[in-house]
């Protein structure tokens, strides 16, 4: 046809450069979220909490790749006040590239597991790749890290930006205590400095409490009032976990993706769930685990 076009040597690079240019024109703060597992739910929770105060732009679906992030940024508008973008990777160097496109003001690293270990070679390599989210941060940028992850703790000397921990460990700045499940909801006490707040989540599992801690931390950093944070968290449902009651059976559908860490988290929900009868786990295989796949299974 007669449509104008621009001829480029590399269409992917061109798309990324256009997206980076577009992002630079927008002054809104953006929070980048990465991690082997938990990044989508954490990103959704952060966005939900921030909606207690702002008009929020967030990743569309799971468009967190080298192609997906530029496509997502295409939908950014001048009405948006704050952004929460997911940053995925399957090969070395990809998080740095996404950081150059997004230029996040803050980076969140949820977890370092074994997803994509086939391409990355080791958990150490995966960890350093995830921590490369710091490369795209501005001078005054900072990190929020999962303080319960062994790999993140191991590689702290690699971190060149100010950081805070969230999690269950005693030295985490944003902490949860007294976690319990009641009537299909998760209750916990949020601890920050000398502050103590009772929180209610509509999703199950300790891993979701961890995700919620990241969301609360970001909410407080961006001045969302605590009452609004509580209200937003209590109405969060997320895309990942559906609980269906039918004919006396309870089905917990947590089937979006499978890695050893997410599988363990789902099995813990199943074992903690109050049931009068049998508990049945329906599991698929887990991909991209390399030569250690049998032992992970």
Language-model segments: what does each one mean?
Residues 15-19, 43, 66, 95, ...:
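A general structural signal for well-ordered alpha-helical segments in protein cores
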Residues 1-17, 273-275:
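N-terminal leader/targeting and accessory segments in enzymes
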Residues 5-7, 30, 56-58, 163-165, ...:
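Conserved beta-strand scaffold positions in the cores of enzyme catalytic domains, especially
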Residues 13-143, 147, 151-159:
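Phosphate-binding loop of NTP-binding sites
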Residues 237, 255-297:
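Active-site beta-alpha connecting loops in nucleotide-dependent enzymes
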Residues 15-18, 46, 50, 72-73, ...:
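Buried hydrophobic packing segments
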Residues 59-60, 85, 201-202, 216, ...:
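Thr-Gly-centered strand-to-loop micro-motif
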Residues 1-3, 108-250, 276-277:
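Acidic, Mg2+-coordinating active-site environments of NTP-dependent enzymes
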